Amino acid sequence: MNRRLSIFVIILFFLLPVAARAQVTGSFRFAQLTDIHLNPNNPKPTEDLKRSVEQINATPGIDFVLVTGDLTEEGDRTTMLVVKSILDQLKVKYYVIPGNHETKW
């Protein structure tokens, strides 16, 4: 048991200076879009997404956009391509995290 404690203390001794040197390199701002639920039978979510993209593009200082799931109602390829074509109009990078609607739950 003492040997384990000694090894732990030695490892901790070498790791503390590394942790102490860690610094925040700056801040960032992002926008999040979620639960868009685009549906070919309902134009409202498509209009909402287009308006959101316009608002994000008009907002200064946004570094990236997170799109956190449920982009489409049914997860079909055609609707996902529509979502992509709209998101491609963003002036910043975007990152998509699939939701249960994209993975066919």
Describe the function of each predicted region.
Residues 18-82:
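N-terminal active-site segment of His-dependent metallophosphoesterases
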Residues 1-8:
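Bacterial N-terminal signal peptides that target proteins for export
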Residues 8-17:
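Bacterial N-terminal signal peptides
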Residues 77-105:
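Extended active-site neighborhood of metal-dependent phosphoesterases/phosphodiesterases
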